[in-house]
Amino acid sequence: MLKDPCAMVSLSDAGAHLTFFNDAGFGLHLLGHWVRERGLFSLEEAAWRLAGQPAHVFGIRDRGALKPGYAADLLLFDPARVARGPKRRVHDLPGGAARLTTDAVGVHGVWVNGRQVADANGLLPDAPRAGALLTRFSD
């Protein structure tokens, strides 16, 4: 099913049920498990499935590829190490409520609209809020 060209492997409801289960890190799992360990996808095909395909399907014109004029969204990772870490419970919701989370493994940095927002240690505390709400897609 993952190899079906009509299947989108890059959608998640991470956060919708965060107290019960956690889909965060599904992209890292795709890169580590299905690309590196199982060889089901090439690295290029996985990058397309995670970024290019959703931008194409949803008509988001300036996303999904590294091209002049496109938003410079980038995940820098080590293909030999990339994975998601073990799931763990944290108590950082209102009232000290618990949720599940997972850490990135083998990720060196994240850039949103050309601005670095995370490094190998996690979110940068002084990073600008570089994201933008997309309100229009192509017709």
Predicted regions span which residues?
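Active-site microenvironment of metallo-dependent hydrolases
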Residues: M1-D139
